[in-house]
Design a protein with these regions (language model features):
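Short, basic phosphate-binding NTP loop
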Residues: 1-28
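Conserved glycine(s) of the Walker
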Residues: 36-37
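Flexible phosphate-sensing "switch/lid" loops adjacent to ATP/NTP-binding sites
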Residues: 1, 27-31, 40, 47-169
Length: 169
């Protein structure tokens, strides 16, 4: 609002201009609001796919705290990896549940490089799972998009931006 009221233009680019295409199937988990349960939903989907014998590599929405050059591409397959990358408490809360289940999760700030690394992960990759953040839409073109809504906040699915985008996709 401050930018617009000062006379400048501000536009959030749409999905066609921002989403990257993967060579692997992509499942994206997003939400209309933060706090709807994306992380729990993501972990359950990973669990179900792993039970089917698929190798799932998760990619987390960025939390750019600290040295962004060092955070270009981060791969977490163990608790030690989380400590080596000096993850914040918030990052640990998101990533630790994946690695203790034996899943690999990527993060960072260069999402083209992250996607290519995930597709070629040393442990293998059959499916990329986008674990969204806040109420943003996915950075990767999903083959399946799961949008989580909060039953305790009815109506919010149509009144929060950009979360409403994922509901309408």
């Amino acid at each position: 609002a401050r930018v617009n009221s000062a006379g400048a233009s501000f536009t959030l680019l749409g999905t066609k201009a921002t989403m990257l295409k993967s060579t692997k199937p992509v499942i994206a988990v997003c939400a209309v609001r933060t706090g709807c349960g994306k992380s729990q939903t993501s972990r359950k989907i990973v669990e179900l796919l792993m039970e089917q014998g698929l190798k799932v590599v998760a990619v987390r929405h960025p939390m750019p705290y600290g040295d962004l050059i060092k955070q270009k591409v981060q791969r977490f397959a163990s608790i030690e990896d989380l400590h080596r990358h000096n993850c914040s408490i918030e990052e640990m809360e998101e990533d630790e549940p994946h690695v203790i289940r034996g899943n690999v999760i990527y993060a960072g700030v260069d999402y083209e490089a992250i996607l290519r690394a995930a597709e070629e992960d040393p442990k293998g990759c059959d499916v990329v799972l986008w674990d969204g953040g806040n109420n943003d839409f996915p950075f990767y073109t999903p083959d399946l998009l799961v949008t989580v809504v909060d039953p305790h906040r009815p109506g919010h699915e149509l009144s929060y931006y950009p979360g409403e985008i994922t509901l309408r996709q």
